[in-house]
């Protein structure tokens, strides 16, 4: 469906969500949309993505920021990545501990010297309840100047080995943004890193395929290759078309545009 810019799309992670309260997740999504969308007044799509994700990191509801799951040694290591489509600027962090990993990724992007920094930040933070089935968070945005941005943040896989880095801070895998499209993914990082669904959607869009068709094709290929219960994604293109898909039990998500707002939980292929 096509929306009037500026547009902000977010997700709270694809997964089973068996132990999660639906109402709390949707409330956190609405707060994220409000906080992120406010950035359009003075900032670009990049700032909208950062603030929307930071809001979800702060909530403690999702597997990101305060809600991050623990690794096999009982510690917390977080990953996040951010990309600005107009300049292909990227900032990513891996295996860090911070209240807002997406802000750390934003710092890397603004500095412009490197793309991915690992194990550079260890903040003391008050963690939330990470016993739920919350998952990776992400956002994509289109501002009134036509610029696209994408970002993703996660605490990784519960019980992972220390030092494990998933797809979330890797451009083309957990997130990607160009002048054509912005994508944020969620799911099993070890699989996403092998197929690079975010990059594949951009390639199909560059070949002239509509966004919905591109998303369905990539989701179909991923599911055919690796089975189900492993991927969800949101996508937004330069024309304001938005799309979402997942092959898991649910993927809380929402969209806010110049004219309205919607949130979803387990409704398949709706945005």
Residue ranges and their predicted role:
Residues 1-271:
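Alpha/propeptide regions of enzymes that mature by internal proteolysis
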């Amino acid at each position: 469906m096509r929306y009037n810019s500026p547009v902000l799309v977010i997700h709270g992670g694809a997964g089973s969500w068996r132990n999660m309260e639906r109402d709390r997740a949707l409330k956190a999504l609405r707060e994220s949309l409000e906080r992120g969308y406010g950035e359009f007044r003075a900032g670009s799509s990049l700032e909208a993505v950062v603030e929307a994700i930071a809001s979800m990191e702060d909530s403690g509801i999702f597997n990101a920021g305060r809600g991050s799951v623990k690794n096999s040694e009982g510690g917390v290591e977080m990953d996040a990545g951010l990309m600005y489509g107009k300049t292909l600027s990227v900032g990513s962090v891996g295996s860090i501990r911070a209240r807002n990993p997406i802000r750390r990724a934003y710092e890397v992007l603004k500095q412009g010297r490197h793309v991915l920094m690992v194990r550079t930040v260890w903040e003391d933070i008050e963690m939330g309840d990470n016993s739920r089935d919350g998952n990776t968070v992400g956002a994509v945005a289109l501002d009134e100047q036509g610029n696209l941005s994408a970002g993703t943040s996660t605490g990784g896989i519960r019980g992972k080995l220390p030092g494990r880095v998933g797809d979330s801070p890797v451009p083309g895998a957990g997130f990607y943004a160009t002048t054509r499209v912005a994508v944020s993914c969620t799911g099993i990082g070890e699989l996403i890193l092998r197929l690079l669904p975010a990059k594949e959607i951009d390639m199909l869009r560059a070949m002239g395929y509509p966004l919905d068709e591109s998303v369905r094709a990539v989701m179909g290929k991923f599911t055919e290759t690796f089975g189900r219960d492993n991927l969800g994604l949101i996508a937004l293109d330069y024309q304001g078309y938005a799309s979402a898909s997942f092959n898991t039990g649910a993927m809380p998500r929402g969209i806010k545009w110049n004219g309205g707002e919607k949130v979803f939980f387990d409704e398949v292929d709706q945005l």
